[in-house]
Each structure stands twice: as C-alpha cells, then as structure tokens.
Amino acid sequence: MDYTVSSLQCFFLVLCLSLLVCSNSETSYKSNKKPILINFGDSNSDTGGVLAGVGLPIGLPHGITFFHRGTGRLGDGRLIVDFYCEHLKMTYLSPYLDSLSPNFKRGVNFAVSGATALPIFSFPLAIQIRQFVHFKNRSQELISSGRRDLIDDNGFRNALYMIDIGQNDLLLALYDSNLTYAPVVEKIPSMLLEIKKAIQTVYLYGGRKFWVHNTGPLGCAPKELAIHLHNDSDLDPIGCFRVHNEVAKAFNKGLLSLCNELRSQFKDATLVYVDIYSIKYKLSADFKLYGFVDPLMACCGYGGRPNNYDRKATCGQPGSTICRDVTKAIVWDGVHYTEAANRFVVDAVLTNRYSYPKNSLDRFW
C-alpha cells in the first residue's frame, strides 16, 4: 500500500512538473514574438513616403518639436503610428519608398500623404496593396538567398496590418458637391469597397490581424473653416462644420459595418475597428479640460484668429508663424494634428475604450 501511494505521488509530481515546463515554454515563446507593424494610409501616418516617392520637400518647421528636422511627416513631431511603435518598443516605421536607409525588419509603411481609398491620386490604397504584395514576395526571395534583415513568412503572418484612409476621399467629394451631404454619401460605398478589397487581399496573402482607424471630425479642421464661406447655422455647438462631420460619421458607420462583415467572413482573423473620431471630437470639445487652447486655430500658419490659416501663406511658407506653445495646440498646420494631440489620441486608444471589439496592441503578440 505504501509503495502504491508513493507511486501515485511520483506520478502526479512528474505530471505537474511537465505541465509547468510546457507552460513556461509557451509563455517564453509568446514573449519572444516581436511586434511587426505594416501600415497603409495617408498623411495621418505617412513617415516619409511622399518625400521619398515624389520628392516633395517637407522641411522645417515640420518636425521641429521632436526630430528637429524635416522627416516627411506633416506635423511638428511624432504621429500616432510613431507612438504606437514606441509603445511596442520598436523602431519607427520606414517608408516603403525610402531607398537610402530603410529598416524593414520590424515593419514597413506604405502610407503616402494625399492618398485616397479610391484610385484618384498616384498612391491610392490599391497601389499600396500592390506594393505590399511585391514587398512580401521579394522579401521571401531575398530571405531564401540568405538575407536576414527582412520580415520572414512567419513575420508577415503575425504582423498587425493597420489602415487609416478615407479622409481625402470625403474632402474631395465635399468640394465637388459644393459641401452638399447627399452626393458625398452616395460615393461612400465605393470608398468602402476599396478598403474591403484591400483587407481581403492582405488576408489572401496571410494577414490575420487588422487594426482599422475610422476618420476624424473633418469639420473641425481650421483649414476647412477658413476656406469655405459659412454662417453660424453651418456650424455645430463647438464651431465645427456640420456637413463635414456628418459625412465623416456616415463613412464611419459604413466602415464599422464593413469590419463586422469581414470579421464574420474571416473567422480566424482578428479585426479591430478604432474610433478615432470620438477621441478627436472629445479633445476639440473639452480642450480646456486637457490643457489645450484654440482647437480651431492652426499653430503654424498665417492670419491670426479665428483659424490662422491662409492658402497664400501655409505652414512653412514665407509669412507663416508658429504659435508660442505648440504643446498646447491641437492642430499644427490647419489639417494635421500636433505631436501633443497625437499623444492624447494614442493614450485614449490604449485604454481600449475606443476599439471594437476591445483589444489592445499588446495582445496581438
């Protein structure tokens, strides 16, 4: 009897040790997965694509706050995607079009300023997706030849694919319709179709993790308020263009529906919809609460109040000036957010209160 009890004790001890070893091995494996980000988009997340792609000079004062030089980013410093990289303890994303000193080991950025979901300009979403397919295929070829500084097949499979696009489509449609709601809304399904095809293509090539930003409150941009004649009835309670924000909300509603549809279609994929609109609108509405000033004024521009924006002297052009304290400004150049505002947005995103389904960046690896 004593021998039997001792054997059972030994058996359970060995079993527990085995489970512990397996558990530790699994934990170690998960912790060793390094985050990889692959981004598609426009100027909201362009880290130098337009500079490399078309040679458009974007120098100081752009970049003055953090990089202290022009990097191709349209802003005074870091973008949302840069703060994501910092949070994940990885280097900033190199533009796909950068031919001089790119680092593609932990990701790549296909975003180009001015890009649209529809095939309107040089680097629309469909072209960015084609570039991705070529990049993936070429990376595999080079790795098979001995290269070790690129994303391997497992890396592409475990990468997070981020999409932030659509604002330029909506603005162009608004301009074409003389700021009329109905004609713009009629074009939204075609915009969403391009995003759908993009996600489907990435999925076809092995992508299983998606992070999709909706579009922000376009009607709160100082540029829009400055270039379009309007009266008080055109504005909402915080002074933003109603029609701009209404079309943005219509687009976002359709984008959320699309994400839900694709989530049902791709059972083995994770697709997170991030409500950037709500974060940015809250910042503009409650700016004093968060230590900001003048939400409807460009920090870098010309003309003074109410919007400090003039097409003849935009940020960086002769005559333009920079506000006294950029850390308290929300909008940098009339369109793009300041580094301080981008940090606010990322801090809000990382609470998981604005993502559907609720998911954090850290949980993807």
From Swiss-Prot:
One of its GO terms (cellular component) is extracellular region. The keyword Amino-acid biosynthesis does not apply. The keyword Ribosomal protein does not apply. Coiled coil: none annotated. One of its GO terms (biological process) is lipid catabolic process. Glycans are attached at N137, N178, N231. Its EC number is 3.1.1.-. It is found in: Secreted. Keywords: Glycoprotein, Hydrolase, Lipid degradation, Lipid metabolism, Secreted, Signal. GO terms for molecular function: hydrolase activity, acting on ester bonds. Residues 1-25 form the signal peptide. Its main location: secreted. The active site is at S43 (nucleophile), D333, H336. InterPro entries: GDSL, SGNH_hydro_sf, SGNH_plant_lipase-like. Belongs to the 'GDSL' lipolytic enzyme family. This is GDSL esterase/lipase At3g62280. The lineage of its organism: Eukaryota, Viridiplantae, Streptophyta, Embryophyta, Tracheophyta.
